[in-house]
Amino acid sequence: MEIKVLHFVPQWPKQENAAVLFDLFLQKIGEEAEVHVATMSPVKESSGENFRKYCIGSGKADYGKHGIVNLLALQKRFLTLLYQLMPQVVHIHGSYHFINSRIALWSRKRGFPVVFSPYGGMNPEFIDQEYGMRTWKLLSYQKKMVRNASCTLISDPHEGDYIKEEKLSERIAFIEDPTKEEHTQLDDYADCTLQVYQKVLDTDMGKRIDRQSQEAVSALLHLSLAGDVERQPLCSEDILNLRSITPKKWRDIFLYAAEQGVTGYINDGIARAQLAVPETDAGTADHFPLRYPKDTRSLTSDKLLTPNLISRKAIERKLRHTRGAERTLCTMLHNLRYHVGQSSLSLRHLCDLYEVLRHTPLDEDALDIHLREQRIHTFTRRICQVLHEAAYLDEGFMPVAALDDKGTEKIRASLTKY
């Protein structure tokens, strides 16, 4: 599938050699991807051989504290272009430009992954030499861009060392600068850049998976967890949806399942549905480390995970009055609440809870009392709502009535927070 990329260059290179080289780079990228370039330089909007330029503002305009009107106008033009093109990746070029930080913020807040190329701007020697010309605020913007970017693309190893030492980001990709290294050709540079784009798209799949694929995941989890061999637990719409999934979406599903620790359940659901699924490279696909790694191990049911000693002792005192399956379930719920707070909640944890609720006999009256005493009754109602959405848990297996409110939304957000 062809990747669509929107490049943002605040100022078009003024030196002829640099401008020609950048044009060649964009053309090489355009041979394998759909490339669009936005700039603030007064260039005519034009279509090159493999890319198209757009002028969205004037580089001479004031965008500082006295230029709020200009900044709002620029934001409107950029967002109009962004939603018109709907790129898969936004690639920002250049260092120490206030507008770069705004472009990154506007893109990231709307769910578009951002790749940032500082071109030596994060080299500590450059920072020391140029700091007198840079305000502390501009340096802060620069560091924040690196911290929040889906990937920082560097060509200077000293930049990478500085970024790691400052603990700004672990999402770094190093590619030799073709203008400095004789053995690095422009073709290789473009190929490596495309690989970085794909690596970015293969990371944080929970943020990018579409609704059809999400519904397919829920159906497959339900099919695997229900364990009902006497009847088909899926409706005709779910079956039709599963049979209409494209190979590209199957790849996304397996990437998402790997992030959430439910690949085994997905494979079991596929086998039960007798689906013919194409082979994918999802198992070997390269990706960047997650900012909030998901705990893909089984949900602990025999001990509390809360590190706070006082809180743990208080919960343990209340658990003493709970026995058997009810005690196991209450412990799992306390640990689920801990994972939500740590942003490490995964579908694997919800699957473990689903199996207990579905296949373990529970005294619902006694359980209701225990949940209220331990102050997790409302949390349990919210978890039941999320389980109903994520794996189609039937109301008959819910120990309490489901609740959909702002607290439930926080649990959903924890699942997709990377």
Question: What are the residue ranges of the model-derived segments?
Answer:
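N-terminal subdomain of nucleotide-sugar transferases
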Residues: 1-44, 187-191
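Nucleotide-sugar donor phosphate/pyrophosphate-binding loop at the beta->alpha transition
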Residues: 113-115, 123-144
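A short, charged, and often flexible helix/loop element on the N-terminal side
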Residues: 49-77, 129-134
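A short, active-site helix/loop in glycosyltransferases that binds the activated sugar's phosphate group
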Residues: 147-170, 189
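Conserved NTP-donor binding/palm subdomain of two-metal-ion nucleotidyltransferases/polymerases, i.e.
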Residues: 203-418
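Membrane-proximal helix-turn-helix segments that form the acceptor-binding/catalytic region
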Residues: 24, 109, 135-151
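An aromatic- and histidine-rich active-site surface loop
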Residues: 90-118, 122-123
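C-terminal alpha-helical cap of glycosyltransferases
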Residues: 175, 179, 183-209
